[in-house]
Curated annotation (Swiss-Prot):
Principal localisation: plastid
An example molecular function term from Gene Ontology annotations: monooxygenase activity
Organism this protein belongs to: Pellaea andromedifolia (Coffee fern)
Name of protein: Ribulose bisphosphate carboxylase large chain
Enzyme Commission number(s): 4.1.1.39
Length: 441
């Protein structure tokens, strides 16, 4: 026989390797697969491994010029999903050499770039990734992290409080700054630009930054506490985004903000580097996440987006609430909250954690609870999220019948009451409403 045999071949001959022992340096992925009727699970799993690594639909002569064995992704395990018909979890191991160092963009392009449109699959969802220290060490990660942020703000032993300024679109810069001042003066730690506030005709970014900085310094002088406002630096180009971050630094404010999914991981990582080099904290909003993570059987779970963000860099990230207006299952939410802030997270399928993740010493990210929460949720939030979190009340502050500042006071008083009650050993789940009522007096 001459050369090699061309033609379409079964992926599972090369890419389904149940005997494979995973390496410490491999990136591991768990995919929830729904194969098309008549496609065996092994073939589907192998196809996923092939298409997201070295495979193509036919044998090519250039395969002879490289070592497939060294570079191919391998589907090393498949398990049926309990309670679902024709759904499987496929485990795939990728050799580290397939990925560019320090690039979340390249990691995602490789793992989820192409394979989700694959004909043999009806649906595919990336449930989790195991990032080996050999790879995570090539990333800077969060510009500062939880501990450094607490030291910069001089705030300890409690969750931090935030508030999104509403109405999100339409206020002039001067009135916007006024709303910021009232909230911070009332006792909040942070206020926030809404994710869609960038630089629109009714309020250009530079004017907003100036009036907000004035509000910050005034409220700081009056309360003796460090205050912040997440100035949204998200823009249409990376250059413009960095220009806004530079101006924020020149004003001397403590924190800026970015929409990391719409802005993109490349822009986000650039901004994170700038923030670390210039002492700015970085707040991350997850606008667009539900487009990717809402469907159970197709897309990417938020825990994958959360891991990607911790690598790319951010000091805060929105992470659902467990109690407010947006959906979130408690155990699963706490699973990715721990993936954001802890050093070492044990595999625990009941919390949706498919792999043990060791971040070594990469800084942690504050999870932000935001969306439809108000003062009566405070005991539950304090209990669920613990101290290392940011609790954000938009309408729950500005909707106070007496105005913004009293709304802010109410939130701060409720938080302090819950933290004190917890520290005294009271049961927040049972006595929550009572604790809030006492605090109202």
């Amino acid at each position: 026989g001459v050369g090699f045999k061309a033609g379409v071949k079964d992926y599972r001959l090369t890419y389904y390797t149940p005997e494979y022992k995973t390496k410490d340096t491999d990136i591991l992925a768990a995919f929830r697969m729904t194969p098309q009727p008549g496609v065996p699970a092994e073939e589907a799993g192998a196809a996923v491994a092939a298409e997201s690594s070295t495979g193509t639909w036919t044998t090519v002569w250039t395969d002879g010029l490289t070592s497939l064995d060294r570079y191919k992704g391998r589907c090393y395990d498949i398990e049926p999903v309990a309670g679902e018909e024709n759904q499987y979890i496929a485990y795939v191991a990728y050799p580290l050499d397939l990925f560019e160092e320090g690039s979340v963009t390249n990691m995602l392009t490789s793992i989820v770039g192409n394979v989700f449109g694959f004909k043999a699959l009806r649906a595919l969802x990336x449930e989790d990734l195991r990032i080996p220290p050999a790879y995570s060490k090539t990333f800077m990660g969060p510009p500062h992290g939880i501990q450094v942020e607490r030291d910069k703000l001089n705030k300890y032993g409690r969750p931090l409080l935030g508030c999104t300024i509403k109405p999100k679109l339409g206020l002039s810069a001067k009135n916007y700054g006024r709303a910021v001042y009232e909230c911070l003066r009332g006792g909040l730690d942070f206020t926030k630009d809404d994710e869609n506030v960038n630089s629109q005709p009714f309020m250009r970014w530079r004017d907003r930054f100036l009036f907000v900085a004035e509000a910050l310094f005034k409220s700081q002088a009056e309360t003796g506490e460090i205050k912040g406002h997440y100035l949204n630096a998200t823009a249409g180009t990376c250059e413009e985004m960095l220009k806004r971050a530079v101006f924020a630094r020149e004003l001397g404010v403590p924190i800026v903000m970015h929409d990391y999914l719409t802005g993109g991981f490349t822009a986000n990582t650039s901004l994170a580097f700038y923030c670390r080099d210039n002492g700015l904290l970085l707040h991350i909003h997850r606008a667009m996440h539900a487009v990717i993570d809402r469907q159970k059987n197709h897309g990417m779970h938020f825990r994958v987006l959360a891991k990607a963000l911790r690598m790319s860099g951010g000091d805060h990230i929105h992470a659902g609430t467990v109690v407010g207006k947006l959906e979130g299952e408690r155990e699963v939410t706490l699973g990715f909250v721990d993936l954001l802030r802890d050093d070492y997270i044990e595999k625990d399928r009941s919390r949706g954690i498919y792999f043990t993740q060791d971040w070594v010493s990469m800084p942690g990210v504050f999870p932000v609870a935001s969306g439809g929460i108000h003062v009566w949720h405070m005991p539950a939030l304090t209990e669920i999220f613990g101290d290392d979190s940011v609790l954000q009340f938009g309408g729950g502050t500005l909707g106070h019948p007496w105005g913004n500042a009293p709304g802010a006071v109410a939130n701060r008083v409720a938080l302090e009451a819950c933290v004190q009650a917890r520290n005294e050993g009271r049961d927040l789940a049972r006595e929550g409403n009572e604790i809030i009522r006492e605090a109202c007096k």
